[in-house]
Design a protein with these regions (language model features):
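Alpha-helical scaffold elements adjacent to nucleotide-binding pockets in ATP/GTP-utilizing enzyme cores
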Residues: 20-24, 28, 48-51, 80, ...
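SF2 helicase catalytic motif II
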Residues: 66-117
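Switch/connector loops and helix/strand junctions flanking conserved nucleotide-binding motifs
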Residues: 18-20, 43-46, 72-73, 88-91, ...
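Conserved interdomain linker/interface between the two RecA-like ATPase lobes of SF2 helicase motors
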Residues: 103-190
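Conserved motor-coupling elements within RecA-like helicase/translocase cores
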Residues: 23-63, 71-77
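Flexible beta-alpha connector loops of hexameric P-loop NTPases
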Residues: 33-42, 87-99, 159-168
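Conserved Walker A/P-loop ATP-binding site and its immediately adjacent core
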Residues: 2-25, 44
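Loop/turn-to-beta-strand initiation segments
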Residues: 5-8, 32, 56-62, 76-79, ...
Length: 191
């Protein structure tokens, strides 16, 4: 994307998470990396705003930021990365405007004819559903850090169980069976 002269927006759910990513990206991309978030002074935000909108500027081709970075005046956006896309911090409740940054990133990418990459070890249910419906592509990691075993994920349509008069709870029959088996083995459960 950068070789094509385009810009990259790297969204993080929390400002506190930017330090590690900034160091890694600046090591590789140097002064092409800029950071933008609401805790910057007005002067700092204006400076980044100007660099991002300037078609002749080679600095700040990669912008790392939280939700507010979506509103920068990108002049040639080629890729938006939404790291930890499942995180509730991407939802803006107060003050207005109310929005979901992940969904806004997808719309912004379409407006710029850019690509969107949603990253998460635990994707949001709607994202996982969109991959199952092949609306989104899915890249799976088959090995976890430290050799931890991958969980077995099964999607169950509760509406079908309700129609068959098999279940009227918020939990599917296979989930309840798995919980019972885990408890019988004295294992822990997290919902």
């Amino acid at each position: 994307v950068l070789e094509e002269g385009k810009q990259v927006l790297y969204l993080l759910p929390e400002i506190a998470l930017t330090t590690q990513i900034i160091h890694r990206l600046r090591t590789y991309f140097g002064n092409k990396v800029g950071v933008y978030h609401s805790r910057f002074s007005e002067f700092e935000r204006v400076e980044i705003w100007q660099h991002v909108s300037d078609k002749t500027s080679d600095s700040y081709r990669v912008i790392i930021g939280a939700r507010s970075a979506l509103f920068l005046p990108f002049n040639n956006l080629g890729l938006i990365i939404v790291d930890e896309e499942h995180d509730m911090s991407y939802k803006q409740f107060e003050p207005s405007p109310h929005y979901q940054a992940r969904d806004s990133a997808i719309v912004l990418a379409k407006l710029h004819e850019a690509k969107t990459l949603l990253g998460s070890a635990t994707p949001a249910i709607e994202t996982y559903n969109n991959t199952a419906r092949e609306k989104y592509g899915l890249v799976s990691l088959y090995q976890r850090y430290g050799g931890v075993e991958l969980p077995n994920i099964k999607i169950v349509d509760l509406r079908k169980e309700n129609r068959k008069k098999q279940n009227y709870t918020l939990y599917s029959k296979p989930l309840l069976e798995s919980i019972t088996q885990a408890l019988a083995k004295k294992e822990q459960i997290i919902l």
